């Protein structure tokens, strides 16, 4: 059987067009063995291979090579599917660049919003003597169809009512196979969008007619025209959605926390109110200490495992001991009545129940075909996770450095530990059992959402816990001697220290970022969109030394620190002896320590003379200070502790840990005592180099860093990619996000324009997600009460109201703010549930402070917010739901 590949491509001098495919004749998928195509003139390239008649379907790609440089197509490959009775195939392809409407190719649209039911799939199979047309048209709505109309009777003579409809089985690619003899050797054609039922024309393709010509038609040849893109008028789509953590959901079936199956009620409500997205916080297992500290969803013990608290126990099974079951039922009712999540009691009860249930039915579950398939597909992460969980329980700590012979992960040792003959097997298999049921329940929700045309949007944390399975199994992928965080911002004046180790991107790059790809592909089993938490981390991360506590002592990594010579060239008189160590002056001590000043001097400081002091060896790092005062929470000790931490922040430059002798200006260095000690000329010089360092110097450098990583990761799944790009944003970030078509995040109270207090919603980019607030902020009602002067300006300048602003955010004001956000050009408007409810004075919570999910400035915050009304109640609120539906519809969403 003969297959001829043909493609038009205009090459430059020295370039060659290559063909790489899964067959032996095309290099078996190895790019280094790709074949060189023949140039037949006029930019037409071709290549013919002989293959067995029994060949199976295969994928292939085109490449352009010039020396060592390679230009590749978009990540979606071409696919050859053998047909019927054809002895020769002509594949007339088009080069595939990344489409301009990339978000519509994501599974958020193909499997969710524009999901098309296919009770009996009919994949396109070419046959001898036919021409098959394949075209990408991802923006067609579920009630629309694509027709092929043309200049010959077989194509309806330009009459849509007589034209043939394309098949959407492989949506967003459409296909149609026609008899070549009826088409003739040459004709013109276009594609037309119509309503499926009425055949009412929605849109014709724009531009000149397409032309097909075959000078040598053959009854034994199957021709496939592929790679076409629908060239229609722009049809903007805007959607709305709700953001809420799973643990915050409340239903009548709950066990004191939200569960995966509760999301089906939220899907129903989204459908009822014209919403298409449900955005969640991370749902991975965070069990490390067994305390409420594990409520923090961004500190997972595994980037793959799901959290056991999200299981609906009644769907897993009921205990055979009726008295014991009755005790759990009573506890469930008690916990479900609580206003907030009691994390410790809920998780303790659920794990106790699951242990009992596992004893009763675990063997049957683990011997089922469904579980065996799940285990085969997930063993690479499931077995290490289950072993980690067993060892954590056994040693009473997640700090694997305290696990004796298991402190360093050894694959063969863990295989023995998990073997069925191991005395620890049952403790390991318990976690197999739990993860399998979590998989079943979340998969059920995903399928339910797909059928409803609703998208589940997940969240990818930027960091991993330093006491996690990932750090235990793959320590070489992380910089374990560092901590990730964020520089100071509106949320935290001392910056944020998340405690996570940072990524060693150089090591990760060696295997093509395999760990990241596996993580994202696993996530795509349950979600069709995701939010990259702190997308700036892919450009650079705020890295803090392990012996520091405050984010103020961090620096960017990767970065280009300054040498003393470069500082001198910029006119700055650098002196490491006092500019890189805490600069403590006598006159500041009393302001900080008050009546305890003399005691602090005696116990913790060293007099250097000339009014300067050093911290003694007991207190020369922030980690030592925190450890020393651990457990001391009286007023005096807290004041002294915080004062000493403040003194340690008083440095003007920080030495780079990887490049000794090179330095970073300390963030907000102009607020230090060392800066105040400079003369005016040196202050001005520092200000100039500071601005250049933080806002200009690294733009191209960080852009290159991001483009090494993000394209590979974005292309690894079909999920819609959104980025959290708030905070200190270098100019390269929006540029790269636009290039990769990653949706940005827009919030009116956090504008990205300089010298602007409130964002202009009408100027938000189309490729963005807009919202009123996030889980790290107060809701719009809480924000309204935080700063009366700012609120007054918003009331007058943004809302255009005159007079005094109300002291509280009244429902009509909330409605105005919600409508303003909905009016933005942003593709998505995803609001917290609390802000949707704020427009109704009867339904919203009385105290807006009780709606807070997280306070970033508090490093040990208890994440326990729950809805104050149940989802069943919300679904029954017909008047409110209709009002919300109409509000969203009026906004064009």
Regions found by a protein language model. Give the residues of each.
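A short, amphipathic beta-strand motif
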Residues: 2-7, 129-136
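Residues in well-ordered beta-strands of folded domains
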Residues: 6, 20, 38, 63, ...
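Aromatic-rich carbohydrate-binding modules that target alpha-glucans
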Residues: 10-55, 65-85, 137-185, 194-217, ...
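Short secondary-structure junction motifs
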Residues: 14, 57, 143, 186, ...
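Boundary detector for helix-to-coil junctions that initiate low-complexity/charged tails
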Residues: 91-101
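Catalytic cores of glycan-processing enzymes that make or break glycosidic bonds
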Residues: 101-132, 179, 211-893
């Amino acid at each position: 059987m003969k297959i001829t590949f043909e493609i038009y491509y205009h090459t430059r001098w020295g370039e060659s067009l290559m063909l790489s495919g899964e067959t032996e004749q095309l290099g078996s998928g190895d790019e280094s063995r790709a074949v060189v195509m023949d140039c037949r003139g006029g930019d037409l390239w071709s290549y013919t291979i002989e293959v067995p008649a029994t060949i199976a379907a295969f994928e292939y790609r085109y490449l352009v090579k010039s020396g060592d440089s390679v230009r590749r197509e978009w990540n979606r490959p071409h696919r050859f599917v053998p047909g019927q009775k054809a002895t020769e195939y002509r594949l007339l392809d088009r080069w595939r660049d990344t489409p301009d409407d990339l978000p519509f190719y994501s599974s958020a649209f193909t499997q969710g919003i524009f999901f098309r039911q296919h009770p009996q799939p009919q994949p396109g199979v070419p046959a001898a003597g036919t021409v098959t047309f394949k075209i990408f048209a991802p923006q067609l709505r579920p009630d629309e169809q694509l027709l092929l109309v043309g200049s010959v009777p077989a194509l309806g003579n330009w009459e849509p009512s007589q034209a043939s409809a394309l098949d959407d089985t492989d949506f967003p690619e459409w296909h149609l196979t026609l008899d070549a003899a009826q088409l003739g050797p040459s004709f013109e054609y276009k594609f037309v969008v119509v309503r499926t039922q009425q055949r009412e024309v929605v849109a014709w393709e724009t531009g000149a007619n397409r032309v097909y010509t075959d000078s040598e038609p053959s009854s034994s040849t199957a021709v496939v025209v592929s790679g076409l893109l629908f060239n229609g008028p722009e049809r903007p789509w805007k959607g709305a959605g709700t953001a809420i953590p799973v643990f915050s959901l409340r239903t009548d079936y709950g066990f004191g926390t939200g569960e995966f199956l509760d999301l089906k009620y939220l899907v129903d409500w989204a459908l009822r109110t014209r919403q298409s997205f449900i955005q969640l916080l991370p749902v991975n297992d965070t069990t490390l200490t067994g305390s409420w500290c594990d409520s923090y969803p961004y500190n997972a013990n595994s980037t793959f495992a799901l959290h056991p608290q999200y299981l609906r126990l009644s769907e897993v099974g009921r205990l055979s001991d009726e008295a014991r079951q009755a005790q759990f039922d009573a506890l469930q009712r008690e916990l479900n009545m609580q206003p907030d999540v009691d994390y410790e009691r809920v998780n303790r009860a659920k794990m106790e129940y699951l242990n009992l249930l596992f004893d009763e039915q675990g063997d049957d579950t683990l011997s089922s075909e469904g579980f065996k398939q799940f285990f085969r597909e997930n063993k690479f992460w499931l077995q290490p996770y289950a072993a980690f969980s067993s060892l954590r329980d056994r040693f009473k700590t997640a700090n694997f450095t305290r696990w004796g012979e298991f402190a360093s992960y050894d694959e063969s040792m863990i295989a023995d530990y998990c073997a069925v003959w191991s005395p620890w097997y049952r403790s390991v298999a318990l976690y197999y059992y739990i993860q399998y049921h979590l998989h079943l329940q979340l998969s059920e929700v995903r399928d339910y959402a797909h059928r409803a045309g609703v998208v589940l949007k997940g969240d990818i944390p930027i960091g991993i816990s330093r006491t996690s399975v990932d750090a235990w199994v793959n320590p070489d992928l992380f910089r374990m001697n560092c901590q990730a965080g964020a520089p100071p911002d509106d949320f935290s004046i001392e910056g944020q220290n998340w405690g996570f180790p940072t990524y060693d991107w150089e090591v990760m790059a060696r295997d093509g970022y395999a760990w990241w790809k596996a993580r994202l592909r696993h996530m795509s089993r349950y979600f069709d969109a995701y939010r990259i938490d702190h997308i700036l981390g892919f450009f650079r991360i705020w890295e803090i030394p392990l012996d520091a506590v405050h984010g103020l002592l961090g620096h960017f990594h990767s970065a280009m620190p300054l040498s003393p010579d470069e500082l001198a060239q910029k006119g700055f008189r650098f002196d490491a002896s006092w500019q890189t160590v805490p600069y403590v002056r006598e006159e500041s001590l009393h302001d900080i320590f008050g009546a305890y000043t003399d005691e602090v001097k005696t116990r913790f400081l060293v007099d250097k003379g000339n009014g300067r002091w050093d911290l003694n060896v007991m207190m020369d790092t922030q980690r030592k200070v925190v450890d020393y005062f651990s457990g001391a929470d009286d007023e005096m000790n807290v004041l002294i502790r915080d004062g000493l931490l403040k003194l340690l922040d008083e440095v003007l430059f920080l030495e780079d840990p990887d490049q000794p002798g090179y330095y970073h200006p300390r963030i907000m260095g102009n607020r230090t005592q060392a800066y105040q000690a400079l003369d005016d000329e040196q202050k001005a010089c520092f200000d100039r180099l500071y601005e250049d360092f933080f806002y200009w110097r690294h733009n191209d450098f960080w852009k290159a860093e991001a483009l090494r990583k993000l394209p590979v990761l974005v292309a690894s799944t079909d999920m819609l990619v959104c980025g959290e790009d708030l905070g200190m944003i270098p100019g390269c970030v929006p540029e790269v996000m636009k290039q990769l078509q990653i949706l940005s995040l827009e919030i009116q109270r956090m504008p990205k324009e300089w010298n602007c207090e409130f964002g202009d919603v009408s100027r938000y980019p189309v490729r963005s997600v807009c919202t009123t607030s996030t889980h790290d902020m107060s809701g719009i009602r809480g924000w309204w009460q935080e700063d009366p002067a700012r609120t007054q300006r918003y009331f007058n300048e943004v809302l255009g109201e005159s007079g005094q602003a109300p002291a509280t955010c009244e429902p009509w004001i909330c409605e105005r703010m919600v409508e303003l956000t909905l009016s933005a050009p942003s593709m998505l408007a995803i609001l917290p549930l609390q802000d949707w409810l704020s427009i109704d004075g009867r339904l919203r919570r009385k105290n807006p402070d009780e709606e807070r999910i997280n306070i970033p400035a508090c490093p040990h915050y208890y994440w326990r917010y729950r809805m104050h009304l149940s989802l069943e109640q919300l679904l029954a609120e017909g008047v409110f739901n209709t009002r919300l539906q109409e509000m969203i519809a009026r906004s064009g969403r």
